[in-house]
Amino acid sequence: FLRWGLAFLRQANSAGLQRNTLATLELALESRTAMQALLQQHPIDFDHEVSGKLHLYPSAEGVQGAAAMIALKRGYGVQQRLVNAAEATAIEPALSGAPWLAGGVYSPEEEAGDPYRFSQGLLQVLQQQYGVQALFGFDTQSLRHADGRWQLQARDGRRLQAARVLVCAGIDSSALLKPLRLRMPVMAIKGYSFTAPLGSNAPKVSITDTKRKLVFCRLGERIRVAGLADLNDWNPTPEPARLATLIAQARASLPEAADYEHIESSWAGLRPVTPWTSPIIRNLGDGLACNIGHGMLGWTLAMGSGERAVQQLLGMT
């Protein structure tokens, strides 16, 4: 934790923020292009919409503070603009129930979709059209290289061999790679989400409440709310008190966005975060590569990361 924390602090300056933001932005734009190409060929149904996004701020200072980053992103073709409270409410009428709002940043090209439904649909395409075999429940305990092959052993004793291995195991990647003398600076930051029926005044545009660090995302006839960031919490089990905190914060932010009395499902996940907040996508040698450390942007960066990871694994870069 201490080593990771010191590395994180070394990035905590304006130069580091700009460098890391642009690195992540480039990957996000690659992901958008890759997703568009995939959906043209395979129209997977996952509540996908180009709904736009509003980053909301409780003070005018916060809104103006985002201006420099907007100008920087504009050079990469990203469409964003500053909006005051009235303009934000005109874009998303559901914000009429947010008296704390001072203004925000509007990104009209932002997309939304259900990652679970997408993953199910993509797996079906891969199996039916490309002959991919999925092996679930293989809890990998160790990874070693012998006789020109990678040997994987599961906790139940099963074994696999492979010529190439791509490690995408989130926070568990560090434990798998450490015996190979490969240290990965990845920290677990636990986040929560819940999904509920739409409320009486649910937003259509995706909403980020920067004051409470919450995200509201409409998925068809449901709405998903995500937030919280519990540093160095390696327990994947949801804690009822923390989930209750998330629900209370969502109520305070947008009280009519969801039917908070009828939560359909809740979830907690361990976000694998690097000190510089962008992922590690690297060829590690001998047919081994890694694709880890996406933090809270795993869904945003997934497609571009996958393309880069395959290139690294096959030695194309």
Label every model-predicted segment:
Residues 152-203, 239, 256:
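Central helical "cap/lid" subdomain
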